[in-house]
Amino acid sequence: MVLIDYSKLSKEVAYALRHAPWEYGLELDAEGWVDINQLLSSLHECEKWKKVSEHDLHVMIEKSDKKRYEISNGKIRALYGHSIPQRIIKEQKCPPEVLYHGTARRFVKSIKEKGLQPQGRQYVHLSADVETALQVGKRRDIKPVLLIVNALEAWSEGIKFYLGNDKVWLADAIPSKYIRFE
């Protein structure tokens, strides 16, 4: 039997839904909703949360002294406290010369062959700085590989980029010819 610290789980979920969904590979809709299975899949990448189930998310909500989350129709959202701007309409933006992406070593071969793909999300998520990219990559691998994306060159050749916030850029699929592996 696995004992779950629901208070710590709530803090993890809050961080994922309110503050840094990009670190968890989550794409919130205009109202902040995300598919529960997507959240669970991301949580399961961390050893501490491998056994968390949808039932545990319901228990977490019930045990809380404040109503922080809502579950409906297979989706979950934080009700308040978001520190990220809601991105309802994504406007294309010219990116900086380079952007970064941290990834697990096990994905490098596929990325070299197919480029960076959204992997079930609407966009590829890129970081404006090395530190953020590596932090994101460490969610899946203790020694992530840093990818350097020649974003301005890709933009000039028709790849679309969108500004998510000051640390995150979104893009359509990026062919491997624009990526350096470090």
Swiss-Prot record:
Domain of life of the native organism: Bacteria
E.C. designation(s): 2.7.1.-
Keywords: NAD, Transferase
Enzyme class: transferase
UniProt-recorded Gene Ontology molecular function terms: NAD+ poly-ADP-ribosyltransferase activity; tRNA 2'-phosphotransferase activity
InterPro entries: Ptrans_KptA/Tpt1, RNA_2'-PTrans_C, RNA_2'-PTrans_KptA, RNA_2'-PTrans_N
Role according to the record: Removes the 2'-phosphate from RNA via an intermediate in which the phosphate is ADP-ribosylated by NAD followed by a presumed transesterification to release the RNA and generate ADP-ribose 1''-2''-cyclic phosphate (APPR>P). May function as an ADP-ribosylase.
Name of the protein described by the UniProt record: Probable RNA 2'-phosphotransferase
